[in-house]
């Protein structure tokens, strides 16, 4: 079965998307956005949803004057083909209480991976922002990966590594090749995690990787990248099967992130996202799910604050301590996030 890549999906669906703070909301969508932002948060006693601390485990930043992002080209991503900095992010949180963030690598040119890691370590060392850790980029398919990781192996601000697996030049099954598996095992020995960002029809490979690397914590990004509006029944069945297999591995977790990008720009509502999100929450259980913002990529469909509001709307009937696990506590535990 042909598998859909995240960027191929973006190319097909987001040419008319709106970027968060840089572009005004279109007139036809103002009422819906306003209603979403004004939805009364769940309240228990004197505490409501907007009092909950949030750890955003998927904060992208990129400075295009410094880094090259080979994937950031074409009409689909034109509106995010500019620099996005911490100062931009901090202006977009709305009523939401983001107290910690974990940087997520941005698939820079491989020659710049070390520089990217050093850049975000600098941000982690500053007190004027909430970044407490980072998932850095790395080429786990390379025999040089161990050498690359040497400077970061004992740094507790480096929480883990990601290799994007859905790029066109990365074949199905790459994460199960011998060198790749050995490097994922090596991450476990270092106490680092590995993020799985892969095609929805290939999640079973991720489940197998979890079996081969029992000492390494794996986190499936973006609910497994299944488009919320897809009518491809075979793909959905393959995704669900893979997610169930992954959930059977106690070392594998699910990140509730990225899903908003697969919704219809300027024509989505929280109920469009709910089936995929509820499936993930039910399959993995609340103790193995964690929140991610995926900013600025999320802005191809919705501003960051609207994505957070939508997720709060979807889970509003859950107890606030349950929600605190999803939005904050699980992230701190899974990624071993430490205070500044």
Regions found by a protein language model. Give the residues of each.
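Active-site metal-binding loops of divalent metal-dependent hydrolases
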Residues: 59, 106, 223, 294-295
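Conserved, mostly hydrophobic/aromatic
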Residues: 58, 101, 134, 187, ...
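Short helix-capping segments at alpha-helix termini
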Residues: 126-130, 157, 212-217, 249, ...
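Active-site gating/metal-coordination segments in enzymes
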Residues: 38, 111-202, 208-211, 224, ...
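Active-site gating loops and adjacent loop-to-helix segments of metal-dependent hydrolytic enzymes
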Residues: 63-102, 155-171, 216-217, 224-229, ...
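Mid-to-C-terminal alpha-helical segments outside catalytic/metal-binding sites
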Residues: 3-57, 67-70, 75-78, 82-100, ...
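Catalytic pocket-lining loop regions of alpha/beta-barrel enzymes
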Residues: 65, 173-290
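Short, electropositive alpha-helical surface patch
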Residues: 111-127, 216-220, 270-282, 306-314
